[in-house]
Amino acid sequence: QKRVRDYLGKILSSSNHLLSLINDILDMSRIESGKIHLEETEVSLSDVLHDLKTIISGQIHAKQLELYMDAMDVTNEDVYCDKTRLNQVLLNLLSNAVKFTPAGGTVSVRLKQLPGTAKGSALYEIRVKDNGIGMSQEFVKKIFSPFERERTSTVSRTQGTGLGMAITKNIVDMMGGTIEVQTAQGKGTEFIVRLPFRIQPEQHRIEKIAELEGLKALVVDDDFDTCDSVTKMLVRVGMRSEWTLSGREAVLRVRQSMELGDAFHAYIIDWCLPDMNGIEVTRQIRSLGDDTPIIILTAYDWSDIEAEAKAAGVTAFCAKPLFMSDIRDTLMTAIGQNQAEQEKPVPVSYTHLR
């Protein structure tokens, strides 16, 4: 039975590899003959990145890599674009990063909306970075040419047609964007893609929410950019926001706010903090008698920690990369749930009323 399973696994792996080679060749052929056309539809960039994370997670776990995904300053997450081709570009870049990063390495994807575009459109920058084997400057000059692969012992052992980057470059060009690469042998590689998209109409934009307006939140994350980004999102929905990079500082802020009578209405805490994790921060906040909603941010699958987190007093989870719609929906649910709990009638015991 074990031998049969091994054979079936090898057959499946070989079949998938052969299929990917054929698809690359067909795509390149269609591109060169002008038969590929973009089909724009309504697309949520939040969905694109969360789906990408789901698709690539198997490869990430198989190679024991760390994957970090983030979204910065994205005020327009609903756009018009060819979702299939955008996914193809991102998967090509991310799969390459995984492929050429040794076990224990780190791969990151960061999406940022750039300022200064014409009304009705927006420019987005996507950076895919790894700390893998990198590339020589000689190879970088021809990386976007068809069938080109770097001739090193490490790369030669890695499967591929050498068409992925050529296809990616052609799709980016068709979308009216640009792609560049920064790399050094032994230090890793970063691909930087900039793409212009038409944004969806005004009714899709996030406005201030009456139920959240004026409420105060504390953001706790050891990454300054995340604190800054989440704070901007909270201000956009009408909340007041403070932030700190430390779990211990967060607990101190909570204690001070309670003593001053200016308590927080929500806590947004990263799971992986350097001084104490988000669950321990939650325990310490709850030990102060504070029942304010606590939302844990995590770039990982939270199923393994969910029971422990709930027992510690965590109200809800929110997955990175974090978008406006994610934080808005999670806040509305968490704060609404907390208010409902407070409004429940207190059960009366008749035992001592005889």
PLM feature spans:
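Helix-loop junction within the histidine kinase core
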Residues: 29-40
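Disordered, acidic interdomain junction associated with two-component signaling
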Residues: 58, 62, 70, 118-120, ...
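Short conserved segment of the HATPase_c
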Residues: 135-149
